[in-house]
Structures are given as C-alpha cells and as structure tokens.
C-alpha cells in the first residue's frame, strides 16, 4: 500500500505539472490483460488526490473514457465522437500492432477469432455506420467517448 501511495503521489505531481485539459482512459475495465483497469485506477487515484488538494486546474479538465476492441458505448451514452479518416485508422492499426500483447487473439468475450486490431477497426467503423444511419455525417470510422466526472 505504501508503494501504491508513492506512485499515486508521483502521478498526481505529473498531472499538477502538466495541468491537462483532457485525459483519456480506458473505460473497458473487463480487459483480459488487466492493464486497462490498473492504468485507469492509477489515473483516477491521482485525480482524486488532486481533487482532495483543491487543484484548480481540474475544473478545466475533462476525463474521457474510451472502449476497447470488444464493445462500444451504447449510442445514447456517447458524449463525444471523433471522426477517423482512412489514414488515421491505418495509423491506429499500426500503433496497435506495435504492442506485443495485441499481436495474438485474446480469449475474451466469446468465440471471436478476430485479432485485436481487426475488432478495433470493426468497432470504429460500426460506430461511424450507426451515426450515418442516424442521418449524421459519414466518416470512415469514429472513436466514441463517455465523460467521467469525479465525485
């Protein structure tokens, strides 16, 4: 617990130094590797510490949660959708492929045999298709976010 507290203070100090206007965290907390939950919990703990200390920069900061490759936010819960061009989607795929943990299929959520990057692209394209079907602008893909508001 002492080590965790030291890490939280270090993370809090980094946030205080940067004073970000936006923080992006994984909202897919059922990640098979467990890393998404660990990272998200670390960010939330640092934000909570900053809040306890009365950090003024927090009122100008939004925390956005994205989903992993297995599921998307329900359309009625999406609070920000960012269009992704074909070139950006390729860059996202290449970024995913640079992570060894994403190179193989993960035994998670059923019998989906697609690789992580394939599920990710299909999810982003599916979100764009849904927005198009609702009569909104048409894009290659979209990344959807839900805002996390610390209590």
State what each model feature region is.
Residues 1-9:
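Single conserved hydrophobic/aromatic residue that forms the stacking wall/gate
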Residues 10-31, 36-39:
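Proline-aspartate-enriched helix->loop->beta-strand connector
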Residues 28-32, 69-72, 89, 101:
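Short, solvent-exposed loop/turn segments at secondary-structure junctions
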Residues 38-52:
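Glycosyltransferases and closely related glycan-assembly transferases
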Residues 48, 94, 103-151:
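C-terminal regulatory/interaction regions
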Residues 49-78:
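Short, flexible loop segments at boundaries between secondary-structure elements
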């Amino acid at each position: 617990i002492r080590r965790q507290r030291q890490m939280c203070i270090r993370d809090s100090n980094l946030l205080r130094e940067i004073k970000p206007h936006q923080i992006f965290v994984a909202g897919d907390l059922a990640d098979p590797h467990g890393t998404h939950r660990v990272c998200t919990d670390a960010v939330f703990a640092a934000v909570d510490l900053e809040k306890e200390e009365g950090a003024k920069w927090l009122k100008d900061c939004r925390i956005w949660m994205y989903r992993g490759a297995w599921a998307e936010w329900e359309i009625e819960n999406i609070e920000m959708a960012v269009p992704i061009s074909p070139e950006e989607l390729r860059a996202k795929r290449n970024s995913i492929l640079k992570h060894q943990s994403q190179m193989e299929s993960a035994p998670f959520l059923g019998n989906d045999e697609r690789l992580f990057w394939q599920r990710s692209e299909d999810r982003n394209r599916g979100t764009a298709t849904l927005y198009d079907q609702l009569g909104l602008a048409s894009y290659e893909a979209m990344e959807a976010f839900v805002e996390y508001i610390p209590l």
